[in-house]
Amino acid sequence: MKSNAICAIATAKGSSALGVIRISGESLNSLLSHLFTKKLSDRRAILTDVKFKNIVFDSCIVILYCAPKSYTGEDVIEIITHGNPVIMNSIIAVSYTHLRAHET
């Protein structure tokens, strides 16, 4: 069963030094823990690699905000990565098996 979580780029379109990907939904830590090389902790900025099938996409800062103390009232994960659109879109793409993309 797919999650009802959504995922979207939270920074302006185009290249920049940093980009933010925001994911909101239920049970995100258990759904997405396979993407990160380190364990996430509530409200802690963790420097970790984002990986898929042992391919590392980027080293990122990842912050987990557990429900209900988040922007949306659900679990929220913020991935602060390099702002290259290819990197950001790759990170979102590996999440598609569990998440639906935010429609812009």
Task: Give names to the regions the model predicted.
Residues 1-100:
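A glycine-rich (often HGG/GG-containing) alpha/beta subdomain
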